[in-house]
Amino acid sequence: MVKILISTDPRYPVNRKVLRRAVMEVFEKEKITDIDAEISVAVVGRRKMKALTSKYLKDGRNHEVLSFPVEGTGGFARTPDDILRLGDVVLCWPEVLLCAARDNVTCDEEVLKLTGHGVEHLLGKHHGDTN
């Protein structure tokens, strides 16, 4: 079972079902089944995203999505309770809105795409990977 922890400010009307669907679609696409896993998804504003990028990426830009994996030096960390804690996906709501408008898609479609992208990073996929 995959436990999806969602954190969002009430100012950001993100559809939680879409966030959950995005996570589950990536797991299905990657044929990840019969696993106890946990992932968190947070929806934040520009100020919080800028603080995160300043601290962790040292660029201070507003990214649409960031991923913060929880892994040991040799890959995913084994926990005493056998729950695979993958990490956190963080979406910047104002950037989601801008991307949706730019790409002429709905906010839900953009949330689905960006959340899925973030989850793929947590699973070890990176830009340019073909597998």
Task: Enumerate the predicted regions with their spans.
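An acidic/histidine-cluster motif and surrounding catalytic segment
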Residues: M1-L114, V119-N131
